[in-house]
A protein has these predicted regions:
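PLP-dependent aminotransferase-like
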Residues: 69-173, 180
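Short glycine- and hydrophobic/aromatic-rich loop-to-beta-strand nucleating segment
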Residues: 194-195, 204, 209-212, 303-305
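Glycine-biased, low-complexity coil/linker segments
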Residues: 231-234
Length: 351
């Protein structure tokens, strides 16, 4: 019997005239780099994921590395990642000079082996990176149980690590935008979560990503650390910073959520203490370079796509669910094991 083969393209982006129009408006607005559309998208993502803050960046890779910089992870530290993941999950650890520790998967499962995770933790372990593969949220209850059990081994090296008080859980949610488990969205479960908006994802800005965090102390005020060797130019008093962030000035009354957002802006804009939008305000053109950091911000053209995708996202997820149900039905009698995207306590993002 002759069968006609049909080409099914791999995850083409779902774009409409709405996205095209929003991008056109962004281009003609005269504001195409990080600006009002990017800030609006950050607010919408925070509301959608129930997180304190969102920082939009150029990739999930940038977001994952940003977490390590915020935590001060570097040489002498260890970061645990699952062996079954994309290269970026592992490569960002190499970028900061920390030691990469890989944990194998469970048998017949895409999640990491949590017993092996517990065995892999040492006094040098600073971060565990669970991966929500295929948009299915990991068993974070088990992950947090393990890091709490190993709390006595934790040795913090900056103020943020000390405030968290245990090994940090930094989720790779590249596939999991819109997924949930036990009533909580990916993004409000782990301490930090990194999302991808790459062209093949079910929510896309062509290239792009986002970093979110969910910390119980986010609204608490940050305590400063005096640096006696440095004096303020005008007051002559000791310059104050935050432990682990040498050279970054302390801001009176700043909360942890505000500090982490400010640090993320610095780390993603060459250490520039004002973004392009802030510099447009009257008399605010002058800025300082605080440190030699990176360039990985999102642009308003990318954010324009994201704003329309956010509006359409419930329909995009519903359509993917229909397609998955058709695959599940077609494969059920063929002895083919498929991922369980839906259950009593979880809903995947079908990424």
């Amino acid at each position: 019997m002759n069968m006609k083969l049909r080409n099914i393209p791999f995850s083409p982006p779902d774009m409409t005239e709405m996205e095209a129009q929003e991008v056109r408006e962004a281009i003609l607005s005269g504001w195409i780099t990080t600006g009002p559309r990017t800030k609006k998208l950050e607010r919408e993502i925070s509301a959608f994921l129930h997180t304190e803050k969102t920082v939009c960046l150029n990739s999930a890779t940038a977001a994952m590395e940003m977490v390590l910089h915020l935590l001060g992870v570097g040489p002498g530290d260890e970061v645990i990642v699952p062996a079954y993941t994309y290269t970026a999950t592992a490569s960002v650890t190499q970028h900061v000079g920390a030691k990469l520790v890989m944990v194998d998967s469970q048998k017949d499962c895409v999640e990491m082996d949590y017993d092996q995770l517990a065995e892999a933790i040492t006094e040098k372990t600073k971060v565990v990176v669970p991966v929500d593969l295929g948009g299915i949220v990991c068993d974070y209850d088990r992950v947090f149980e393990i890091v709490e059990q190993k709390k006595h081994l934790f040795r913090p090296s900056n103020a943020l690590q000390a405030k968290i008080g245990r090994i940090v859980v930094a989720a790779d949610c590249a596939h999991a935008f819109g997924a949930s488990r036990k009533g909580k969205m990916a993004g409000e479960i782990a301490d930090f979560s990194s999302f991808s908006f790459h062209a093949v994802k079910n929510f896309t800005t062509a290239e792009g990503g986002a970093l979110t965090w969910h910390l119980h102390f986010g609204d608490e005020k940050v305590e400063p650390t005096p640096i006696p060797s440095l004096k303020g130019r005008e007051t002559g008093t000791d310059v104050r910073t935050v432990s682990g962030y040498h050279g970054i000035p302390y801001v009176e009354g700043e909360t942890w959520n505000e500090l982490l957002y400010r640090l993320s802006q610095l780390f993603s804009l060459h250490g520039q203490n004002k973004d392009a939008l802030a510099k447009t305000k009257l008399g605010a053109w002058e800025y300082d370079i605080i440190g030699p950091w990176y360039k990985c911000n999102m642009t308003d053209i990318m954010a324009a796509l994201g704003l329309v995708q956010m509006e359409r996202y419930p329909q995009l997820l519903a359509r993917r669910k229909e397609i998955i149900q058709r695959y599940d039905e077609g494969l059920k009698d063929l002895n083919v094991k498929v991922l369980n995207h839906y259950g009593n306590d979880h809903q995947g993002s079908m990424s």
